[in-house]
């Protein structure tokens, strides 16, 4: 089980699988493995994807909101967000229902057995800002997580969709 972190960029949802989920603690760096771009319709999808298919399992929208690009070059000139991602480091401000404040996505090569050709490995990092936390759980519990859209848990979605356990 993992969290998908998605940002709308260039008419698609750029997507990363975040195994431990996002953290609002700046000391916690989260592995984020780039996945294929998703269509915009995935912003609202909740349901069960058949096991064995890409992304198979139960899906909820854990958080939703808007983001504001913050990336700039060394002279302080703003860098378009798509370019910042291509360059391997993008900063942004999240105004979500659950996640708030400045975050960064930083691409790196290799590490921890994830040096797979064609696989982009990133870190999702919370900035030290007024929205950061330093105590409490460092990762959302996927079994207790509730949808930002419907308030349902994974188990409720699975039961309602006839998909069994999440």
Which residues are covered by each model-predicted region?
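A charge-rich, low-complexity, intrinsically flexible signal that marks solvent-exposed coils, linkers
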Residues: 1-166
